Each structure stands twice: as C-alpha cells, then as structure tokens.
UniProtKB/Swiss-Prot annotation:
Function (record text): One of the components of the core complex of photosystem II (PSII). It binds chlorophyll and helps catalyze the primary light-induced photochemical processes of PSII. PSII is a light-driven water:plastoquinone oxidoreductase, using light energy to abstract electrons from H(2)O, generating O(2) and a proton gradient subsequently used for ATP formation.
Propiece span(s): 1-14
Cellular component terms per the entry's GO annotation: chloroplast thylakoid membrane; photosystem II
Residues modified to N-acetylthreonine: T15
Name of the protein described by the UniProt record: Photosystem II CP43 reaction center protein
UniProt source species: Mesostigma viride (Green alga)
Similarity annotation: Belongs to the PsbB/PsbC family. PsbC subfamily.
Length: 473
C-alpha cells in the first residue's frame, strides 16, 4: 500500500498510519517514533513498556537509598536537620524513627537501615527492568494474559485502575499502622516540645475529616493544609485508605458506565495525560503543605514556617526586654501601636510589631501561653519555659525566606549566608515540577483528544525548507 507521507517525517500519537507495518521493532520505521521519543516506541509492546516502568522505579528507589545514605553520612547530631540541607531524614524522623523528646535525634541507625533497604530494593527493580527490557517477552497478552492489555479495552483499564487504587490504599494504611501500632509517629504538639507517641484515638468523624475539604483554601481557612493535630492526620489516612481500597474493588468488579465511556478518551496517551494532571495537582498540594503546615511537617525537622519565624522573633525580643524591665503590656512602638502586644481585628491579644500580619499563626511552642482571648499576659509574665525561649530564638534566625531585607519583621540578613530552609526547597521544587507536569498534561491531553477526533497527527513537513536543500556531503 502506498503511504502518503514518509514515516520518517511523521510522529504518531497512538497508531501507525500504515496498519500493515510490523510493530516488533523499536526504530522509527516500525513504531513511528524516533529514539528520543522514549517510551512512546513501546506503546503497543506491553512487555517492553513494563521493563521501562520497572527500571524507572528502580532509578527512583536508587536515588532514595543513595541520597538517604548521603544524608546519614553528612549528618551532624548537634545541629538541627533544617540547618544541614536535609530533605529525606526529616521525613524519617517525622515517622518517629531515631528521635526522642523535642525532636532530638538519638539514633541514626534506622536511617542507615532505610538507605540500605532502598538500595537493595533498587537492585531488584533494576534487574527486573533490564530483564523485561532486553530478555522478556515483547508483549504480555499471549503468555501472561492477566498482565496483558489493550489500551482501548475499557473494562481492562478500569481493572488496572482498581488494582492501583488498592495498592495506594494499602500505602495509606501503612502510615496508620505505624502510627497506631508500630512505635507511633512524631507529634510536634506533644506536651513539652514534641515527642514520639502512639496515636490511640484517630479522628473518624466524617464531619471533621471532610470538613477540611469544605474549607476555603484562602486566608486563615487553609483547606486541608490547615490540619493541626495528628489524630486528624491519621484519621484522614484511615478514611482515604478505606475509600481507595473500596474504590479499587469497585473498579475491578464493575465495567465503566455509559456516561464514562462517552466522557473519557480511552487511549494510552489519554491515560498518560490523566496521570500527569493528577500528579501536578498532588504536587501543588504538597507545595502548600510543606510551606504552611507545621504538623505533618514538624518545624523541629523542616525549620519554622514563615509566620512562625516572624512570631518567634517577636517572642524572643519580648522575653529579652521583659527581663530588662520593659512593661510588655503597655509599651508602644514607633507607630503608636503596641510594641510587644496589641489587639487583633477580632480583639485577641497578639504579638505587636510587623509580625501582626501573622497574628493567627499557630505553633506548639507558643500555644501553651494562650488563654481564652489570645495571648495570656499572666502566662507571658510567669510561665515561659526555657525550651520555648530556645526554640523561638532558633526559629527567628532560620526563616524560610529568600530575601535579604526584612520580611514580616524577620531580620533575614542573618540568614543570607549558607542557609536555605528545607521548606523553601520542598515548596519551590514541588511547585515548579508540578507546573511542568501540568504542561505535560495539557500537551498529551491535546494530542490524545486530537487522535480520538481523527485530526491529523503530527506536523505537516512536506513544505519544510530543509527538505529542498542539498545534502551536506
């Protein structure tokens, strides 16, 4: 059959233009994709695509293990984690491994074990990736029909979706089991400055858990990022674990309804676009969580939030000047407002000065000093504990801010040399990567929709100037 265009000049979305061609190779002629298109060459080769995905998982796990051991090798117990540029050890510490009261690291061996386990796992995954890429069957449908698939098989696709959902649900329950039965997790709100504890009474009330979803994402509401206790965190994982597992079973046992069959595009590239969109959404949520939340991301390990550092500075100077004889209740600042304390718009007693903008900040080192109407003057005069002073002094000099001038009253120039908060790293990296994933979602969604609608795929190159130029030799 005569083809209208050269296959070398046409890049395909899902199917080859010439249906008579073999799909067994990995070159441009047989797949319609050049080498730099990567896994697109394997769209119809389920065995080889499995190898690519397993190898990719191996690379991810290898990075986790190697970076884990790198951080362990460079870790200095005398310094806080957030001062050492660590991003993996804080996650392990949050899970309750190797830490004691106040977030003090008392044993680094669990971190070493974690790194080694990840490296061993990456070797297994790497072997599987190489095997399925080079040795195993090119397609799974004939030899292993359970693992085989056709992209347009709607029932098979939802079955695969269901299996993935169940695996995610089990993952959510791993945190629940760790928190409730296997040693507990680190709770920054534990009395006395945080500690590892067993979560014995996780929140199961749907009104509380789903109430977070109904909150506004703006202002003081904070949507799900406003969670401020470990009972709600673990209870939320119980709910999401149940929903994922039961949703997975549902998708395995049922076939897509008619409206779903009509609404979605059922092709490999469409599934890729859906996945990229979901990852982008989760990346943006993770960005906000790591920046604003100090419960799931304890400040003992990740450093203070911006508002927390600002409030810590106001608190530190209040403690200092009160010892020097200042009347913290009535002293005025240069603007006539309270220098140390003032009233919020709703009448609560709050810290004065420029940190007033963060008056609704909540942090475990300051909450014990509050009363029914904001900060309690009697507690500020008589009940401040040494650990609160030490922590606020540490936090005020480790704001997660990239500015050389004052932001929110924080004297950031003292942070300008050799300090970038893990919150800054995590928030900016997740925001940026989520944006790129979202662009990928739009790109692949557009291509998948065009293919489904029968539009011309690829770029018309018949009139491309370079095709009419003399060869270089």
């Amino acid at each position: 059959m005569k083809t209208l265009y050269s296959l070398r000049r046409f890049y395909h979305v899902e199917t080859l233009f010439n249906g008579t061609l073999s799909i067994s190779g990995r070159d441009q002629e047989s797949t319609g994709f050049a080498w730099w298109s990567g896994n697109a060459r394997l769209i119809n080769l389920s065995g080889k695509l499995l190898g690519a995905h397993v190898a990719h998982a191996g690379l991810i796990v290898f990075w986790a293990g190697a970076m884990n051991l790198f951080e362990v090798a460079h870790f200095t117990p005398e310094k806080p984690m957030y001062e050492q540029g660590l991003i993996l050890l804080p996650h392990l510490a949050t899970l309750g491994w190797g830490v004691g009261p106040g977030g003090e690291v008392i044993d680094t061996f669990p971190y070493f074990v974690s790194g080694v386990l990840h490296l061993i796992s990456s070797a297994v995954l790497g072997f599987g990736g190489v095997y399925h890429s080079l040795i195993g069957p090119e397609t799974l449908e004939e030899s292993f029909p359970f693992f085989g698939y056709v992209w347009k098989d709607k029932n098979k696709m939802t079955t695969i979706l269901g299996i993935h959902l169940i695996v995610l649900g089990v993952g959510a329950y791993l945190l629940v089991w760790k928190a409730c039965y296997f040693g507990g997790v680190y709770d920054t709100w534990a009395p006395g400055g945080g500690d590892v504890r067993i979560i014995t009474d996780p929140t199961l009330s749907p009104a509380v858990i789903f109430g977070y979803l109904l909150k506004s994402p703006f202002g003081g509401e904070g949507w799900i990022c406003s969670v401020d206790n470990m009972e709600d965190v673990i209870g939320g994982h119980i709910w999401i674990g149940n929903l994922l597992i039961f949703g997975g079973i549902w998708h395995i046992l049922t076939k897509p309804w008619a409206w779903a069959r009509r609404a979605f595009v059922w092709s490999g590239e469409a599934y890729l676009s859906y996945s990229l969109g979901a990852i982008a959404t989760m990346g943006w949520i993770a960005c906000c969580f790591s920046w604003f939340n100090n419960t799931a991301y304890p400040s003992e390990f990740y450093g203070p939030t911006g508002p927390e550092a600002s409030q810590a500075q106001a608190f530190t100077f209040l403690v200092r000047d009160q010892r020097l004889g200042a009347n913290i209740a009535s002293s005025q600042g240069p603007t006539g407002l309270g220098k140390y304390l003032m009233r919020s718009p709703s009448g609560e007693i709050i810290f004065g000065g420029e940190t007033m903008r963060f008056w609704d900040c909540r942090a475990p080192w300051i909450e014990p000093l509050r009363g029914p109407n904001g900060l309690d003057l009697n507690k500020l005069k008589n009940d401040i504990q040494p650990w609160q002073e030490r922590r606020s002094a540490e936090y005020m000099t480790h704001a997660p801010l990239g500015s050389l001038n004052s932001v929110g009253g924080v004297a950031t120039e003292i942070n300008a040399v050799n300090f970038v908060s893990p919150r800054s790293w995590l928030a900016t990296s997740h925001f940026t990567l989520a944006f790129f994933f979202f662009v990928g979602h739009l790109w692949h969604a557009g291509r998948a929709r065009a293919a489904a609608a029968g539009f011309e795929k690829g770029i018309e190159r018949e009139t491309e100037p370079v095709l009419f130029m003399k060869p270089l030799d």
